């Protein structure tokens, strides 16, 4: 019979013993540079122009398109559990609403401005972030205004985006978050807010490091925002472009961004770390995007992972990389899970 063998060892060095530093659950929390809290969570809301809408999104488990009339019942239990912030995305479904310049984006009767006013009235404690983009509202599905050849008209695009951002702020948004990735839009938005006497009370949260890729499909299903032709690779960053991302971070910070979003998050932790160093005095926000969320759910449904465990692992990774805020479709679950952990 084989007998287990033990090699002779040297006496253990004092500096080699680490286990005593994390053998207790509280110690494991103390070892975390940042601990996930409810205040960090930002929950995306898809608000449709059908006020009574409540439609499940097949590719986004547990997420719905919601009309303004359904918001109160939907948000009330989440706010009671500690939800502090939402980010609004408008979904125009009425035929004929979309046009080449995204006129419906800041329509006073449209879903976003109606959503802002409703939430300000019924949930004044909620911090309202509005995504600023044109893709949901343009007939071509791109994020700006186009030239005749289908390329982005930068000047008209940033002028239009700035107008949308200012109108969201006028309606009561606490924060505007431009996600279009068109050069120079942060400067125009900031200038527009200054000229409207709104800059002192409107936070500009820039999607400075937003990458093109294959993780946005469920979102585009939810927002009905897929481009009708081409793709967005000429204005969203290439996945391998770390240097470009660093330049974009520096640019948006210099143009007046008050905070930075890195999107997607799981595959871009190096960019998140770069952002926390380049923009060290600004809050860094991770966006756990629809494709990442759907992947976790798919893996959990197959029994490959436990959803709660993998959700904490992924989101703690964002904090470790430098994020202080997280836009996440898992916010409702985390409101329960964090109570269980405590």
Swiss-Prot record:
Residue list for modification Phosphoserine: 254
Gene Ontology molecular-function annotations: porphobilinogen synthase activity; zinc ion binding
Pfam families noted in UniProt: ALAD
Record-linked PROSITE patterns: D_ALA_DEHYDRATASE (PS00169)
Record-listed 5-aminolevulinate 1 binding positions: 220, 232
Pathway the protein takes part in: Porphyrin-containing compound metabolism; protoporphyrin-IX biosynthesis; coproporphyrinogen-III from 5-aminolevulinate: step 1/4
Reactions the enzyme catalyzes: 2 5-aminolevulinate = porphobilinogen + 2 H2O + H(+)
Regulation of its activity: Inhibited by divalent lead ions.
Annotated keywords: Heme biosynthesis, Lyase, Metal-binding, Phosphoprotein, Porphyrin biosynthesis, Zinc
Keyword Metal-binding tagged: yes
Name of the protein: Delta-aminolevulinic acid dehydratase
UniProt source species: Saccharomyces cerevisiae (strain ATCC 204508 / S288c)
Lineage of producing organism: Eukaryota, Fungi, Dikarya, Ascomycota, Saccharomycotina
Gene, per the UniProt record: HEM2
């Amino acid at each position: 019979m084989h007998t287990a063998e033990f090699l002779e060892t040297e006496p253990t060095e004092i500096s080699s013993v680490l286990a005593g530093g994390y053998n207790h659950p509280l110690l494991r929390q103390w070892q975390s540079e940042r601990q996930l809290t409810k205040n960090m969570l930002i929950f995306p809301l898809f608000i449709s122009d059908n006020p009574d809408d409540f439609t499940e999104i097949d590719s986004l488990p547990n997420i719905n398109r919601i009309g303004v009339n359904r918001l109160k019942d939907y948000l009330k239990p989440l706010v009671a559990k500690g939800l502090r912030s939402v980010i609004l995305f408008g979904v125009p479904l009425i035929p004929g609403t979309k046009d080449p310049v995204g006129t419906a984006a800041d329509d006073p009767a449209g879903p976003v401005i109606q959503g802002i006013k409703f939430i300000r009235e019924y949930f004044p404690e909620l911090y309202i972030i509005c995504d600023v983009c044109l893709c949901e509202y343009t007939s071509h599905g791109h994020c700006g205004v186009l030239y005749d050849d289908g390329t982005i008209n930068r000047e008209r695009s940033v002028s239009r985006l700035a107008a949308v951002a200012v109108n969201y702020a006028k309606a009561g948004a606490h924060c505007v978050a431009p996600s279009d990735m068109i050069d120079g839009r942060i400067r125009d938005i900031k200038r527009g807010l200054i000229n409207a006497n709104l800059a002192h009370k409107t936070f500009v949260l820039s999607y400075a490091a937003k990458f093109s890729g294959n993780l946005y499909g469920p979102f585009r299903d939810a927002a009905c925002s897929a481009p009708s032709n081409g793709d967005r690779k000429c204005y969203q960053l290439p996945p391998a472009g770390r240097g470009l991302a660093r330049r974009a971070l520096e640019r948006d910070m210099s143009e007046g961004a008050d905070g930075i979003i890195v999107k997607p998050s799981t595959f871009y932790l190096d960019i998140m770390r770069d952002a926390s160093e380049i923009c060290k005095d600004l809050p860094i926000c991770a966006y756990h995007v629809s494709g990442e969320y759907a992947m976790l759910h798919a893996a959990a449904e197959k029994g490959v992972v436990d959803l709660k465990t993998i959700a904490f692992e992924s989101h703690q990774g964002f904090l470790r990389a430098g994020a202080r805020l997280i836009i996440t479709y898992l916010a409702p679950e985390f409101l329960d899970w964090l109570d269980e952990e405590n």
